[in-house]
């Protein structure tokens, strides 16, 4: 019921020009289920719900389908919801996140849109260039993998299994303290007073310690 009601906003209010961009309908309405749980049962329960859907993501083809041939992409529901959940972590401010969701529906009120319009709107509101983020999650089938090592108090890290020049900030926990790192495809290092880190589970990413 929650999902279908969400289509009053993402489908009946905002719709796509080409079915290849069907994620604009299904990803947002799937994530509305998570927002419902967040409101009624709390953040932890909502996170458990959306993270629990990851086992059903196939990553067999990109979320955006080929244009002009009446074909949609794959994983529009569960991968799309996790894409949006990850974006919410990057925004790190639920007021901004609500403004984005409401703003999409006012900015594109009763319009047909393409993915680029949605991307540009969200990037402008979050204040971070999300070009490679969207290219990775919408147009590639790989999930970003944080490759890292810890030696002599130095954390060295980079993104692998990603498109060229991919960049995305990530929150990690070190000795109970949350800190931001800004990985790219090139190795970076910071000093930490621990031999382990914990990656925020709300990001739809993988990690490997080397």
Predicted regions mapped to residue ranges:
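Generic recognition of well-ordered alpha-helical segments
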Residues: 28-35, 52, 83-86, 121
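Beta-strand-rich binding/interaction modules
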Residues: 130-131, 151-202
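Solvent-exposed loop and edge beta-strand segments that line ligand/cofactor-binding
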Residues: 19-21, 68-74
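Zinc-dependent metallopeptidase catalytic helix centered on the HExxH motif
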Residues: 1-47
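Short helix/loop segments within enzyme catalytic domains
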Residues: 36-57, 96-100
